[in-house]
From Swiss-Prot:
Pfam families: ADP_ribosyl_GH. It comes from Archaeoglobus fulgidus (strain ATCC 49558 / DSM 4304 / JCM 9628 / NBRC 100126 / VC-16). SUPFAM superfamilies: ADP-ribosylglycohydrolase. Keywords: Hydrolase. Its EC number is 3.2.2.-. GO terms for molecular function: hydrolase activity. InterPro entries: ADP-ribosylglycohydrolase, Ribosyl_crysJ1, Ribosyl_crysJ1_sf. This is Uncharacterized protein AF_1724. PANTHER family: ADP-RIBOSYLGLYCOHYDROLASE, ADP-RIBOSYLHYDROLASE ARH3. Belongs to the ADP-ribosylglycohydrolase family.
Length: 305
């Protein structure tokens, strides 16, 4: 089980770093500039080097460290940590909804009112630690995913996206089959956003089609209605970690978030991450230590319950 924690956290960061240089590009642009992205590349804007990750991984770390401090998820602690991170980060890629919500928090707005009514994917991209630590109770995973989303995002698709990703990760740690995992995800997401649930279902149905077809049908914008289904498409379409991540990255659009989410879900299933990606990943040892701490916290919680 500890390996699944490790591969989930590292998988998220690997996907983020792979998608970073092509974030915002169309499939056609990616092909013209790079052919097919299969390895880490530097940002064309000069802000990040090959193997470095973006705010997707940074916010995941913020959430993980909050959980490690509070044991059970505390939205007030998470909100305070988001404020601190926002002041300290050098990232120039923070999404519009997160930026506005954290700005609200910094102006003294309580976390219950600071969130922005938006369907962007900031809550889904960072939620992995919740699916890992609390996988012993899918109801708790769903509840914490929802609350963690509301700190910055209050749109139904944004919340549903966070629930989908967290529940998928928890199910994979629990060794659910892909069919059982999908059924559990859909059942819970339907309570938040029917369209998102239908698109995730469809993502599985078209997983034998190519990436161009998937992007045409599902989209690749920053909306959770696009990012989360595309991440599930990539998950189901690849026979292993590498194939899924290459599909996710080369989908373009919000490629780093699509690939980060796909990498987290795929890693939680236990798929091995190619060593060449791990060797080039920024702060690999820090992320491995973070995963170990999350696993140890999970074990302590289980012993107490």
């Amino acid at each position: 089980m500890e390996e699944k924690f490790r591969n989930c956290i590292l998988g998220l960061a690997v996907g983020d770093a792979l998608g970073m240089p092509v974030e915002g590009l169309s499939i056609e642009n990616i092909r013209q500039l790079y052919g097919e992205v299969r390895d880490f590349l530097p940002s064309p804007y000069g802000d990040l080097n090959a193997g470095e990750w973006t705010d997707d991984t940074e916010q995941m770390v913020v959430l993980a460290e909050s959980i490690l401090e509070t044991v059970y998820f505390d939205p007030e602690n998470f909100a305070e940590r988001l404020k601190r991170w926002f002041l300290e980060t050098n990232s120039r890629r923070i999404g519009p909804s997160s930026t506005k919500a954290i700005s609200n928090l910094m102006r003294g707005v309580h976390w219950t009112r600071a969130g922005v009514f938006s369907d962007t994917c900031g809550a889904a991209m960072r939620v992995a630690p919740i699916g890992l630590v609390y996988h012993f109770s899918l109801n708790l995973v769903e509840r914490y995913a929802e609350i963690s989303a509301r700190v910055t995002h209050t749109g139904t698709a944004a919340i549903g996206g966070a629930v989908a990703v967290a529940v998928a990760i928890a199910c994979n740690v629990l060794d659910f089959s892909d069919e059982e995992m999908l059924e559990e995800v859909l059942r819970r997401v339907e309570a938040y956003d029917n369209l998102l649930a239908e698109k995730i279902r469809y993502a599985n149905e078209i997983s034998d089609r190519d990436v161009e077809y998937a992007v045409e049908k599902l989209g690749n914008s920053i909306s959770s209605l696009d990012v989360v289904p595309m991440a599930f498409y990539s998950y189901f379409a690849g026979k292993d970690f590498e194939e899924s991540l290459i599909k996710a990255v080369n989908a373009g659009g919000d490629a780093d978030s699509i690939a980060a989410i796909c990498g987290a879900i795929k890693g939680a299933k236990g798929f091995a991450i190619p060593e060449r990606w791990l060797e080039g990943l920024k702060d690999r040892e820090f992320l491995e230590e973070l995963a170990t701490k999350l696993y140890e916290l999970h074990m302590r919680i289980v012993k107490l319950t």
